[in-house]
Every structure is written in structure tokens, then in C-alpha cells.
């Protein structure tokens, strides 16, 4: 990243090795090898399925190969109450490969980072562990011998549930939203747990410009701010943080995650993680209402994806539907036991999502995002403060306006590839 540095909140060292408790934690949090992932119980990464705590679903859009990837890992780190969930939205020519690489490798790096910390890790220690894991993941992508990430990358939103705590980290515009019951009336309220890290966030734009990157929107899509090289109108990345995208890493785009901590209460019911294909057309509250109304928990993720697909067709009939990926994590750890589930979740790997209409032309360009949703309900749980948030972006989620694709027929994460070679850019 040259001289550009992240401006996230400062991580506090947990200190100490935790004595015998720390040694036991390090034994439990021993990461398996990547070639052993398929044999790990409780780890699911299929395109449609459920675990004992979560349900997942993805559907391919109309722009080519599905570049979204998902993960649920029950018993993460050997903890009975540990669950790690993630959604990864790739972009660029090799975005689908990047997203799957992150899906498989990032949890192992987080496990290793946690193993090196003391027992009973506080939020500050988890902030540090997530930061180390994300940094190691991006380093792995840069040095990978056969994966070209120069103009390809991926978002990441990860949620780790340990007991009554949620620890979250994200880069890009995939999002986590909490469904919680209102104190009075029993209705559901949506609480946005992460912030969409796009170039129009003031602190993100400031960093990019200080690193000589440019931020502006094209005339035909004025609501989509993008990141451009200082000497070329490329690549036009529509997010401020991402894995990969090394053509922009010297110009302000970073892979340092924003970290969030949430203490759960009995009113908190579930967490939705989804790619921007969902949030471009549905508000947080609409998504929570759809999941809450699902007659079957095991079908909740599929119901939300199908609702988003219908909204794309209804609201933006001239737009190409984006890939949609959803993970629904139920915080009580329970899942209904239907026998008609389309997949058992342990140790399944189906690399492609639902198949697109073969009669509709496919485009090989990745997708992109948009400014979108957050509606604060006065007096609701949504007014609770997220711990660990950088003060300069703490209010961004509530300040973001819900904005669909009005007047835009097609939105991609990248506009075009740079005209120069990687050797020229690095040299």
C-alpha cells in the first residue's frame, strides 16, 4: 500500500498468555490445513443448505458466473457456542476465484490469530485478531502464484458469534443486519451492524485522495462514486476497501477491516449477511421482515434471495440482476427439522449458484453496488451503539440514504481494466 495506511480505530493489545486457560484455548483454536477443510464437521459452504444454526442460499444473476461465496462454520475454533459466518462478493475478471479463496483461507487465518492471543479475549483483542487475519489474507492473494488479483478482488463481511457476543469485520459493501424484537409491541426492527465502505464515505474518500487516487462518478451513473487511478480513467472500483485489486492498493484502497462488537440480548433473534445484490433492492427492514415471516427457518435465506430477485425484475426491468447471496444466522442456535431440505449442510461444496436463464444473454463483467439503506426507528434497539467503531464513520450507516438503481440500466464493480501492465504499475 505504499505510504497509505488505514484509519481504523486502534487495536488494544490483550496482553498476557492467559496461563492454563490460554494454553487450552490455543490447543482448541488450532487451524486445520486447507486440504482438510472438506472433512471439518459443521463447516458449510454450499449454494443452498442449512446447519444447526444457520441457513444459506445464493442465486446467480444475469452478468455471467456467480461471483458470490458464503460460509457457515459451527463450532468454530473448537468452541461449542462458536459460529463463524461470512459472505464474499467477488468482482473483476477473476472475482469468483478470489471470493472462494477468501472463503476458504480467511477463517483459518482468523483461527490462527485467535490462537496466538490470550484466554477470554476482549473485544480489543478480537479487533487485533481480525486485523491480522485480513492482512494475512491480502498478502496471500498478492503472492499467490496462479491467481491474478491485479484487477480482481472481493468484499468480505464476517460475523463471529461467541456466547452472547458478536464480533464483526467487513471490507467493501456486503452487509450484516440484525433482526431484533421491539421492546413494546413485539414487532421486528432492523439494526445495521456494519457500514458499507464505499468511496463516498467521507473518511474513505479523504484517505484515497491523500494517496493520489481519484473519486468521482460517471455522468451516466451519478449515484455511483468510484475509485480511479491518478493517471488513467480505470478501473472505476465502486468500493473503498477490498481484498485484491492491487492496481489500486498504492492509491488508497485498503484491505483493513472495520471492526464492530455487539452484545446480544434476549430480544435479538437473527443476523442476515448478504451481498449488495440484496441490499441494492431491499431495505434493512424489508429484509428482516421477510426472514421473520418465513414459515421455515431452513428456507429463510432462499426466501430473501427470491424476494430480492423479484424486486430487481419489478423495480429495474432494464437492469441485469446481480448475484445474490444470503446467510441467516439464528441466535438461539435452533433450526427446524424439516425433512424436505434440499441439502444437508456438513461438508458440501457446490461451486455454482442457481443457474441463470439460458435464453438471456450473459455478460462476464462483475457487478456492483449502490448506496442503500438504513432507517432509524426512534426509541428502538437501532439506537444502541456499536462498540469498536471508528468515530468518523460511526454515524455513516444512519446517514446513508436508501438508493436503488434509478436511471441506471447496469452497474458493475469495475468499469474497465487499466491500459498499462502490472509490471509498469508496480515498477
Curated annotation (Swiss-Prot):
Mn(2+) 1 binds at residues 89-90. SMART domains: PP2Cc (SM00332). It comes from the Eukaryota. Disulfide bonds: none annotated. It is an enzyme of class 3 (hydrolase). GO terms for biological process: regulation of intracellular signal transduction. Gene3D superfamilies: PPM-type phosphatase domain. Binds 2 magnesium or manganese ions per subunit. Belongs to the PP2C family. PANTHER family: PROTEIN PHOSPHATASE. This is Probable protein phosphatase 2C 64.
Amino acid at each position: 500500500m505504499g505510504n497509505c495506511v488505514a484509519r481504523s480505530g486502534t487495536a488494544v493489545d490483550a496482553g498476557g498468555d492467559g496461563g492454563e486457560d490460554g494454553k487450552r484455548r490455543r490447543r482448541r483454536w488450532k487451524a486445520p490445513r486447507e486440504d482438510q477443510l472438506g472433512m471439518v464437521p459443521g463447516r458449510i459452504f454450499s449454494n443452498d443448505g442449512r446447519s444447526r444454526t444457520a441457513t444459506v442460499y445464493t442465486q446467480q444473476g444475469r452478468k455471467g458466473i456467480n461471483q458470490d461465496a458464503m460460509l457457515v462454520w459451527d463450532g468454530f475454533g473448537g468452541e461449542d457456542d462458536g459460529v463463524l459466518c461470512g459472505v464474499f462478493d467477488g468482482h473483476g475478471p477473476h472475482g469468483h476465484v478470489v471470493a472462494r479463496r477468501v472463503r476458504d483461507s480467511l477463517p483459518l487465518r482468523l483461527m490462527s490469530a485467535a490462537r496466538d492471543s490470550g484466554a477470554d479475549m476482549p473485544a480489543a483483542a478480537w479487533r487485533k485478531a481480525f486485523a491480522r487475519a485480513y492482512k494475512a489474507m491480502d498478502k496471500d492473494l498478492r503472492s499467490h502464484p496462479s491467481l491474478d488479483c491485479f484487477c480482481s478482488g472481493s468484499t468480505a463481511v464476517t460475523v463471529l458469534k461467541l456466547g452472547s457476543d458478536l464480533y464483526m469485520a467487513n471490507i467493501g459493501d456486503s452487509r450484516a443486519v440484525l433482526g431484533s424484537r421491539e421492546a413494546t409491541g413485539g414487532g421486528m426492527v432492523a439494526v445495521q451492524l456494519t457500514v458499507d465502505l464505499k468511496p463516498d464515505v467521507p473518511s474513505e474518500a479523504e484517505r484515497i485522495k491523500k494517496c493520489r487516487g481519484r473519486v468521482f462518478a460517471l455522468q451516466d451513473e451519478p449515484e455511483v462514486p468510484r475509485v480511479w487511478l491518478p493517471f488513467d480513467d480505470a478501473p472505476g472500483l465502486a468500493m473503498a476497501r477490498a481484498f485484491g485489486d492491487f492496481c489500486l492498493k498504492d492509491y488508497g484502497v485498503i484491505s483493513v477491516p472495520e471492526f464492530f462488537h455487539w452484545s446480544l440480548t434476549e430480544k435479538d433473534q437473527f443476523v442476515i449477511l448478504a451481498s449488495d445484490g440484496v441490499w441494492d433492492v431491499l431495505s434493512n427492514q424489508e429484509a428482516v421482515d421477510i426472514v421473520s415471516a418465513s414459515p421455515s427457518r431452513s428456507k429463510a435465506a432462499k426466501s430473501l434471495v427470491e424476494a430480492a430477485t423479484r424486486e430487481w425484475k419489478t423495480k429495474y426491468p432494464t437492469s441485469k440482476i446481480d448475484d445474490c447471496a444470503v446467510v441467516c444466522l439464528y441466535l438461539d442456535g435452533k433450526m427446524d427439522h424439516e425433512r424436505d431440505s434440499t441439502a444437508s449442510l456438513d461438508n458440501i461444496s457446490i461451486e455454482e449458484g442457481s443457474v441463470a436463464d439460458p435464453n438471456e444473454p450473459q455478460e462476464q463483467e462483475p457487478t456492483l453496488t449502490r448506496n442503500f439503506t438504513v432507517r432509524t426507528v426512534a426509541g428502538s434497539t437501532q439506537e444502541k451503539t456499536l462498540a469498536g467503531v471508528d468515530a468518523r464513520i460511526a454515524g455513516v450507516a444512519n446517514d446513508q440514504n436508501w438508493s436503488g438503481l434509478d436511471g441506471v440500466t447496469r452497474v458493475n464493480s469495475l468499469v474497465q481494466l487499466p491500459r498499462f501492465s502490472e509490471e509498469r504499475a508496480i515498477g
